[in-house]
Amino acid sequence: MSENSQSSPFFGTESTLHPSLPLLSNSIQPAGTVCNFSRVSTPDVSSAWLLPSASSTSLQPLMGNAYLNPHAGTTMLTVLTEQGQISTSTPSYPGALKWDCTGSTHGREDALQEFNMKLIDQDTTLSSLAVTNQSDKILDPNVIVPFHPTLSSSFVQITPSQMPNQGYSLAPSYQEGSQVYYYEHNNLGPLIAGEFGQCLKAHGSVSYPGSQTSVLQPEMVMVLKEIQPRNIQMPLFTSAFSYSTSAQSMPDNGLPVVQMETSLGLPPSGQTHCQLQSPELCNTCVQVSQIRPPAVNGDKALTAPIHSPSEFLALPPAPSLEQPENKTMPEIKEGTKENQDRPVLTLEHPDLQQPLHCTDTESLRQKPDSDNAHLGCICMGPKELVGLENENGSSFNFKDITRLEADIQLPQLLNTLTDIDQDQSCETWTVTSGPSDQVRKNKHKSFELLEGAPQAKFQHWDLVEGEGAGGVAGASERAIDNMAKQPEGKAPKGPPSKNRKARKQEQERPSGPQNKSKKTEELKQSRNTAKAEENLSIPKTKRKRNPPELSQNSFKKPRTNLAMHMLESVQVFHPLGKKTEKKTGISSFRGLRTFTINKDPGPGSGTVTTTVLNMPCEGQFPPKSPGKVQRAESSIDKDCLSPSQYELPPAGKVKLVPLPFPTLDKPQSRPASRKPLSLALRRTTTVQPHSHSAQPTTLRPAQPPPVSSSLIASAKPAPPISSSSTGPNVTNPNQSSAVPHLVTSRPVPYRASSHTSFQRELVSAARNKVPSPPKPQTKYLLHDFSRQPIPWKKVDILGPVVSQPITKEQRPEREAMKRQAQQERENAVKNPSTGKLQIFLQRERDMEISQYYGYAM
């Protein structure tokens, strides 16, 4: 059936059912086939057209070239074609007529057919109507192809005097290659002339593969319901379509998109019902059905994709103005559920004021979870929508709801909505799942707008990372209880993703039970107990080998050696170390925290802040560290961290203030530190420390060398020097724990290659005490090859190198080596365990050789 074929329904009058017959107005003259109408009791493979009774109805011109001019006792069909006017006057036919169409044997898809439709009734006279149409399929004559046009979706003016509150129904089937709808007009009132227009648009068509006559095709039912808007007594139809199939199984089908646009500017009560009644329907792809009401009352549109053929999804309407028919909706719903296993046979319900397939908006909550197990969206009643709009003050977007994962059950979401309704502390709430940036921004915005004491606000960081508390502390006692109950990730929003769960477990692993007690103690203890709690927290933080701030940041601690190299090469702002209260100006993270947060500097904390806070100005960090510094400043102002923490604050939380410092030309050593250090550079940094004798004069006013040592130590997995180093005069025991990683061994300096300037400052601070390498990693010293020339740095090859053949004396040795290698391979194949051992032994030898020559493996 071609999509551009024009057709028009006409309406007859009967006490209960008032069907109509579509006509085709395209006029083409090829050789054609004959379509016969014969009276049958029930519709079989082909369509059933219910014809009107003896009463008459006067209708105006419909659409296109088709006119309906009925008179008393007859039904006149007038079709205007290019050849002329064809009029057919027939009496009423109260029965059902069978319409079969037989195509020609051979042809192409663009072939044309001419049809002669004959209306045959056994009790009345015979009349025929010749209609031509363009078809896109010509099938085998053995297969009876039901042929139906596409209905026009324009409503027409109807004379109200001759329509005494009677229902009208068009009952064709939904057949192959066509789109036909059922129409039911309950209490059809007058439409204003000239303002009718298209209220329904059928987009696309559904095409099925060639099916036999034994397979019953599905039906599409479009039920039109009347509402009475205010101030204007005119009906506006809102569609509710149900998709019912027969008991046969069929291939992949696609339900077309039906879009309803109200052109009269009246508020509809949009009901969209998608009912898939056959569980044998294999893969029914139901596209999105949209109802677009006008923006008069601000009603929001809902879209609902359905992916399971055994579901019944109902999107309840916006609250209409005058609907006294809502009393019968639960009864209709019960009748609908009983008829779900068989196709819709009739729409004959004279006593009901509602269409057959509809649902109650309030009973949607009481559906079991099994009905909603496969839903990709969430059905929400008008009360929830109105409540959310009143609370949010913003538009409720259904696209955010459709992004909810499928494992969220409907009663859980409704309980969440009621919790939100009760909680007056939150001003905005987004019911979405997934780590979208917009959701996080809305969360931060909602928590910033809260009123209360600054110590009552808990960290946003934990909320973003998945610990998710239900309310903000300090707003009410109930919010505090919710926050105490929900730090384990049981937030009312959707389930967190896997990486959030892993990140939460990793950051709770080192802290243990302190993480729960920390949040509650932050809310209840005042600032005057800061000093005692800090003294209690010092030994606990010293026992922690891996601080949890690495996991609280936006990255995880790398597990492989190569990942550690890459991480330290970009120098992502690590914690600065642990607190040591000594008399010299060692920069410790705890002392810096007491200075910036508690406003209670310890001994020597003035020099602490000046030395540490200037480090980003020297360019020791990558260019993205200023952004992290700004984020740290904003987060430190928002959060007001309580001093009663039992662990180090997260990385990036320190408020860094850039101070004026004379040595701003230090980043000149950065290009050498980005790549693996050459032997010449290592020779200058390790063997000749007196070359940096000019640096201590510029660096000594603020004394950053011990600061850099603590920074280097904190950047490593186990910081050894931050808790033991005392000042610029670094002693030999401290140097023995840190300097072998920085100076003597070859592979590890690559690991700390971004700290080249820190290493230089450390060596210049202890320039008179060149440390002897205590226990190097290999048995070969670094000084053995440090002064050797680098052959790949200079090109001294004059020509191509010609290899010399081995001599006769070397030949037996070479053959013996080959035989030994072959024997080793054979043994490895025969004995896998010894082969693996041999592989490890050989790799150990190779590692030793590579470490001797300075290659980090």
UniProtKB/Swiss-Prot annotation:
Sequence ranges of Low complexity compositional bias: 708-725
Signal peptide: none
Recorded superkingdom: Eukaryota
PANTHER family: GENE 5591-RELATED, MCG1026354, ISOFORM CRA_A-RELATED
Pfam families according to UniProt: DUF4629 (PF15442)
Protein name, UniProt field: Uncharacterized protein C2orf78 homolog
Organism annotation: Mus musculus (Mouse)
Composition bias, Basic and acidic residues: 324-339, 518-534, 630-640, 809-828
Biased composition (Polar residues): 683-700, 726-738
Region called Disordered, residue ranges: 316-339, 484-561, 619-777, 809-836
